[in-house]
Every structure is written in C-alpha cells, then in structure tokens.
Regions:
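Short secondary-structure boundary micro-motifs
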Residues: 1-2, 10, 66-67, 116-119
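Conserved amphipathic alpha-helical segments that form helical-bundle/coiled-coil interaction surfaces
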Residues: 27-109, 127-130, 145-156, 161
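Short helix-coil transition/hinge motifs at the ends and kinks of transmembrane helices
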Residues: 13-17, 110-119
Length: 163
C-alpha cells in the first residue's frame, strides 16, 4: 500500500519572536548546540556541490563586506548552507524556522559591537573561514569547535563587548 505524508503548515515551524534580551541569549545558546553539531556532520557528509555552495556564500559575505554592508542575509545563508550539507533535514528546518530571530541577533550584534566595523567584519570572516576550511578538509571535530567558537564569540561581542 501507499500512504501520503502531509507536511505541517509552515506556521507550525515558526518560533516565537524575540521579545527580550533574554530571548536573544536563549537563541544564541540554542544555536550554539544545533549549529556546531550540524557543522560537524557537514564536514563528514558534504558533497562537492554543497562545499561549493558553502564557499560561494562565504564569498558573498566578503563582497558585502567590501561594500561596507552588514551582510546579515549573506551570513545567514552561509549558516543555512552548512546545515543543508549536514544531510539531516531537521538541522536545516530548525535554522530556517529561526530565520527572523537569527537575523535580529546578527543585526544587533553588528550594531552594538564596540569594535570598529572593519575590524569586526574581518574577525567574523576569519571565524567563518575556520569553519569553511574544516568542512572542506572533512574534519568534523574542528568544524564543530570552530562553529561553537564563532557563535560564542558573536554572543560575547554583543553582550560583553569582547572579541
């Protein structure tokens, strides 16, 4: 026999909007755990095409940075491409459902940073490069550690004004 699976309404997959600083903290905490494991799996499972997409997203951030733009959407797309390369649709779906919350956090981090914008952009892109290189080299442990470090540092930049 055959059966039909009905996909849940997209509204079901949306998280509650960020309504406080505590919500932003919780989102960072959640992302640290989800995205670091996704990066680990992406390093082990990515296809050459997925790696090319990850690199393309990284390059788009560089291009936006050169134009001195915030690159929030490009940054989000890089993270999304990494979850897609994990080849587990749950990681991708969760990150997709957090789109607005993640962008709010990224915008706040960029706008509240005490660092000079160019310096901050370079640091963030260096963190991204560490993740991309680990995924390219299929080093799951290093990819996981690099993603965890990246999200933790973003949280520190926002809440503590540190690098």
């Amino acid at each position: 026999g055959s059966f039909v699976i009905r996909r849940p309404d997209s509204a079901v997959l949306k998280f509650a909007p960020i309504s406080s600083i505590a919500d932003i903290q919780r989102c960072f905490e959640f992302r640290t755990n989800v995205e670091s494991k996704a990066a680990h799996l992406a390093a082990l499972r990515r296809t050459p095409e997925q790696l090319a997409q990850i690199r393309h997203c990284y390059d788009l951030i560089d291009e936006a940075n050169a134009r001195q733009m915030l690159a929030t959407e490009e940054d989000y797309r890089l993270h999304l491409a990494i979850t897609e390369a994990a080849s587990n649709h749950y990681y991708y779906t969760v990150l997709k459902s957090l789109h607005e919350s993640i962008k709010e956090g990224m915008n706040l981090t960029r706008n509240l940073s005490l660092m000079a914008p160019k310096e901050r952009l370079r640091l963030v892109q260096d963190e991204h490069l560490a993740i991309v290189e680990a995924i390219a080299e299929q080093d799951g442990e290093r990819a996981e550690a690099a993603m965890r470090s990246h999200i933790d540092k973003a949280r520190h930049r926002m809440f503590e004004g540190t690098r």
